[in-house]
Amino acid sequence: TYDEGTEVTVTATPDDGYEFIEWDGNDNQSNSFTISVNSNITIQANFQIIQSNQNYYSSGDIIPIEPVVFYDRELTINGIKLLAAGSIGGQEAVPDSWVYKTAQVFKLLMESDAEGIDSDAQINMIKTLKGEIGWHQGYPAGQRIARGGGNEYSPNFLDDNRNQSYPGLEAFEDALALDDMVWYKNIDSQGTGDDDINEIIEHTLHTIHRFGVRGGVEGSTEALNIEAEEEDITNTDIFLAMKEAYTNGVFDIEGYGGDINNRDAWPVMLKEYQYLLTFGMWEFSEFWEGGSLSPEWNDNARTPSGIQANNPLGYELYNTYFKPVISIPSKEILREIFKDDDQGESGY
């Protein structure tokens, strides 16, 4: 209780980890101000959690999805929602151990203290993956994980009738930005640890490249646009680099129909090109069977020097947009995680 006309100083003092944002009942923008009391008034301070950049690096745990919509578990890692198929469609559930291994790979690809990482650009990449900013804002990136291949499920959860076969699946997936699958025990795999590494790195890169790297470095949203169905991409940096690789005999497109002018095939070509370019710049060809993926990717482009000589636009593209935001995972650590016959520990 104060006498009329009394001057009172009001101060909002936040707890650790919080910051003052505004007052209810007063328009003053400062966290401390003085007023003259002439009538009964109510003033309330509002606070919010301070969002530090480190908060964007998250290593969540597996939690159940209820009700089950083909996927029965999820885990969020650095803004990416991993979705694991349950025991459904005649298949056993993807084991938790493989979900953790997938999460650890994403973690290894986004090390904040790795050499050459631009911290601001990497944070922008994670914000883009979360759907907080960027070209798919409102739709967080997801990574689907299932067993073997689509035809290993009866009915196939990837075909046009999937919503009839698995009610609610389409609406569930439509709320996310999704690209490729990560397969546990891929039907094409020989069961070796190196096969697993190649499988999982390829498909996690597809997700990060499309939904995160495009959004990390300034200018990347335009430069790395592969959405050919939505707009003209013929003058983007990514398309020009891919076309140069094709023209120079580095990137063979027979597996994608063989027609460089087929716009419908461009998104897949560009997705695969980014993965192949990255493997070459990392010198990861040893994970390919026999150390080669020729003719799809020429043996002369399995090293940075080879790419610089034979696909200079790709070399520049990688160093400008990929290198500042994606960390190169250790081959030794990957081989500890992925050993032959499904052995190895995630370390997550």
Predicted feature residues:
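Pan-zinc metallopeptidase signature
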Residues: 272-348
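N-terminal low-complexity, Pro/Thr/Ser-rich intrinsically disordered segments
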Residues: 50-78
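Conserved "repeat-terminator" motif of extracellular CCP/Sushi domains
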Residues: 4, 33-50
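Acidic/His-rich structured neighborhood in mature extracellular/periplasmic domains
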Residues: 66-67, 77-247
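Low-complexity, Pro/Thr/Ser/Gly/Ala-rich linker/spacer regions in secreted
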Residues: 46-59, 342-348
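Post-HExxH zinc-binding segment in Zn-dependent metallohydrolases
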Residues: 213-290, 295-298
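Surface-exposed interfaces of beta-sheet-rich extracellular modules
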Residues: 6-33
